[in-house]
Amino acid sequence: MPLSVLQRATLLSLMLVALATPVRAQDIFAVPFAGVKFGGSTSIFDLEFAADKKTFTMGASVVVLGNGVFGYEVDFGYMPNFFKNEESPPVYKPGSYVIDLSGGVLLALPAAVTGGGLRPYAVVGVGLVNAQAADVLEIFQIRRTVPAFKIGIGAQALLLTNNVGIRFDLRHVRSFTGDDGSLARVGRRISYSRFTVGLLLRL
């Protein structure tokens, strides 16, 4: 049976994580984070023209990274009120949101080079973006799940204790799908960037 787009995206995400070859002395980190979403764009029914507005974002990552170059992560982001524009008359009911979930591969500066300081890294991953919203009359109800990719850069270090540190992260999320003019595919494009600061916790 042919795989759906979402199934293929999920399998590709798992393959990216699996292809990140483990190295000796790897550490596992939990990273709860918070920050700001900015620079968004979408063809989904954005009735309040809010996609490009700044909004609060939060989430968490699980990162596996040793002293070498390669690592991998699972990343989850949550953006409440993604379709809410404070400068516009309310159209959507409270509670709209966008979430993203992805698996990714990290390329980090080796610990031997940074000497225990901030370790810069780059990350690329694939996964899914889900958008949910409904207008006050429930005429337009948004329920979209689309495959997407993430690219980003950041830096992290255990600066506070041997097991607690900080992570700075900037990444861009963009759907693979676009709008080709057919009715079935209209409203499936979404992109945004986010800057977050996270608490780095070695498990």
Locations of regions flagged by a protein language model:
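Predominantly the C-terminal beta-signal and adjacent terminal strand-loop region
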Residues: 81-85, 157-203
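Short glycine/proline- and aromatic-enriched beta-strand/turn motifs that initiate or cap beta-hairpins
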Residues: 23-66, 76, 126, 194-202
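Extracellular loop and loop/strand-boundary signature of outer-membrane beta-barrel proteins
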Residues: 44-50, 86-94, 134-142, 181-187
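Cleavable N-terminal export/targeting peptides
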Residues: 1-27
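Gram-negative (and chloroplast) outer-membrane scaffold detector with strong preference
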Residues: 61-136, 146, 160, 196-201
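A charged, solvent-exposed segment within the mature domains of Sec-exported extracytoplasmic proteins
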Residues: 131-177
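Transmembrane beta-barrel strands of outer-membrane/channel proteins
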Residues: 32-40, 74-78, 122-128, 155, ...
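Residues that define the transmembrane beta-barrel architecture of outer-membrane proteins
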Residues: 26, 52-58, 95-101, 118, ...
